[in-house]
Amino acid sequence: MKPTLFISDLHLEDAVPGRTGWLAAFLAGPATEASALYILGDLFEFWIGDDALSPTAQHVAKGLGALGAQGVKTFFMHGNRDFLVGEKYAGLAGMELLPEELVIDLHGTPTLLLHGDSLCTDDVEYQAMRRQVRNPDWQAGVLSLSIEERLQMAMQAREAS
């Protein structure tokens, strides 16, 4: 039986290329032996839209696409940093987007998948912000801004977190 692999919170960004190199080696090596790869959020340090692909995002899409071409199913769940990853990038990378919570059958065991930020239930302010950024209307409004404006918003959010 081929393994099912899970990764999360890599926080990839152009400024830290070593992490992207590690992921590339993983995708071209051990991951090729898997039946599926689940990415459970925060693959990227930030994501400002599928229309603003960084060199890192392009490199990752190529690696994930190559993995999918070898028959490994790849799934993506949004995190608190990359909640704007959309269908366009998912298609480019050969990933299937998942809902916020999902129960899968992991070799006969029901297994709940989620990004850990949903468990910060005592942090009322964070949960309110989380609901806002996951709202499709809010996301559409943000995505209607220029790339420069979205980048500035992302930098401000990173500084505040």
Predicted features and spans:
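Core catalytic region of metal-dependent phosphoesterases/phosphodiesterases
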Residues: 2-7, 12-106
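Short, charged/polar low-complexity linear motifs in solvent-exposed/disordered segments
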Residues: 32, 64-65, 94, 109, ...
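Well-ordered beta-strand scaffold positions
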Residues: 102, 109-111, 117
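Active-site-proximal loop/helix segment associated with metal-binding centers of metalloenzymes
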Residues: 114-161
